[in-house]
From Swiss-Prot:
Name of the protein described by the UniProt record: Probable septum site-determining protein MinC
BP-aspect Gene Ontology terms: cell morphogenesis; division septum assembly; regulation of cell division; regulation of cell septum assembly
Subunit structure: Interacts with MinD and FtsZ.
A Pfam family it matches: MinC_N
PANTHER family: SEPTUM SITE-DETERMINING PROTEIN MINC
């Protein structure tokens, strides 16, 4: 077999970011009702996002019909790509979806908060699929800056994504549908109308600073808030800082004078 590199495709190991849909009940009727309720306010928010079904929170001996959950997610326009399960949950491989291994980006000491919701933070290990380079669609803007501070001085349009391994500084507007992600702090000296996720590897000390807060989503270390829960008038469109306090997002006016 020839080992010559093909100009048309390649196979290599890689990491793919997905949402984790964590199942905590075997009551599928209740799950469906809650899912529809959650998405009816913002039906386009997670449209076409890939998601892995996580069943690790189920009790020993419990199991669910993954095919039904897969259909539920399809019904709200999400795209299930696999299942994350414990080694003892052998039934999880019966749904026709591949079993995936997830690395939780939250720190081991972090607790699950009942009143909070996990942000799209896990990394799922998978092999990259073969692709013809000539047929690829333009990818969203995706930048890394090692562990250094990354500075962005141009507007971010819908569909663009920025990822910083350290802190992230944005000097131009972040439009609806754009996403900025950092393992450290995020500073936005312009309107934030898209998504901002700080401390994505479980850094509970990370903060978000913004001079005009009008976001679709804000998140720190896996705790997030969307427009489903409207922001109060004293912070909407204002200069703010966002931090975590006991697993809750605190949004506070930023006094600049």
């Amino acid at each position: 077999m020839s080992l010559k590199k093909s100009p048309f495709f390649e196979l290599r190991s890689g990491s793919v970011d997905t949402l984790l849909f964590t199942v905590k009940t075997t009551d599928l009727d209740a799950l469906r009702t809650e899912l529809v309720k959650r998405f009816e306010a913002t039906p386009e928010f997670f449209a076409d996002d890939v998601v892995a079904i996580d069943v690790r929170r189920l009790a020993d001996g419990e199991r669910v019909a993954l095919a039904d959950i897969r259909q539920m997610l399809n019904d709200v326009r999400m795209r299930p790509v696999g299942v994350v399960a414990l080694a003892t949950q052998g039934w999880a491989g019966e749904a026709g979806l591949p079993l995936l291994e997830a690395r939780d980006r939250r720190t081991p000491a972090a607790k699950h908060a009942d009143e909070a919701e996990p942000a799209p933070a896990p990394v799922v290990e998978a092999a990259a699929a073969p692709a013809a380079e000539s047929a690829q669609e333009p990818a969203p803007t995706l930048l890394h800056a090692g562990g250094r501070t990354l500075v962005i001085d141009r507007p971010l349009r819908s569909g663009q994504q920025i990822y910083a391994k350290g802190d992230l500084v944005v000097l131009a507007p972040v439009s609806h549908g754009a996403e900025i992600i950092a393992e450290g702090n995020i500073h936005i000296y312009a309107p934030l109308r898209g998504r901002a996720l700080a401390g994505v590897h479980g850094n509970h000390d990370a903060r978000i600073f913004c001079t005009c807060l009008e976001p679709e989503l804000i998140s720190i270390a896996g705790i997030y808030r969307t427009t489903e829960n409207p922001l109060p008038a004293e912070v909407l469109g204002k200069s703010v800082q966002i931090r975590l306090e006991e697993e809750k997002l605190m949004i506070e006016p930023l006094r600049l004078t």
